[in-house]
Amino acid sequence: EIHFLDPRPMANGKLLVRAQPFEAPDLGSQLLEVDTDNYVELAQPTLPNRGVLAGPAQVPATINDVRTVEGPSPGGRYNSAFPLQDGTGRILLTRSQCRLLEQGAAGTAQIVPCSPERLAAGATATAAPLYGVWIYDPAQKTQLPVSTPVEGTVYSDVVAMQPRALPPVLLDRIAGVDYDADLEAEG
């Protein structure tokens, strides 16, 4: 069971969401872009787009192989994301890279990065997540650290404060349609 959390509008008109199971491994999720303007369901476009679009309505927001099930996630996991409204499409996010526990020569576990070789060899004991602040550039397909993670510290929320126009207010009801307009006039 997947939940879509923290929806945020993106400059491209889509919604950025965190897809996360109810019990998320390592507090992590996958980032998705959801096309709410053209779809009503994953593979069901709106009526004007019927026969034109086939889906899916949601696609990964990054190029990383992120998995939301127990065990290693080769592309790491995300804990929060905030699209920058600066015309670049970049996303400020918190991310933990994939880390494994490997038994050292002295029998002690050491933290090592995920690699295709380690994953193919069955190294599935994951290390505790290490969330830092990153910036993702979809045009360049790059992720760069903004704040280097520190063992024992979790960066869990990011926001970008910048001036922008207020979004439109969608009222629950419309006077004269959903209720008597005279009642609204009376206050």
Show which residues each predicted segment covers.
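Structural motif
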Residues: 24-35, 100-115, 120-121, 128-134
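Short loop/turn segments that connect beta-strands within beta-propeller blades
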Residues: 35-39, 137-141
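Structural signature of eukaryotic scaffold interfaces centered on beta-propeller domains
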Residues: 2-14, 70-88, 157-184
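Beta-propeller domains
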Residues: 1-37
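Residue position within the beta-strands of beta-propeller blades
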Residues: 15-19, 33, 90-96, 100-101, ...
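Short consensus segments that form the blades of beta-propeller domains
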Residues: 6, 21-24, 69-72, 119-127
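Surface-exposed loop and turn segments in beta-propeller and other repeat-based domains
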Residues: 1, 37-73, 150-164
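Beta-strand C-termini and the immediately following turn/loop, strongest in propeller blades
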Residues: 17-23, 82-85, 93-98, 122-125, ...
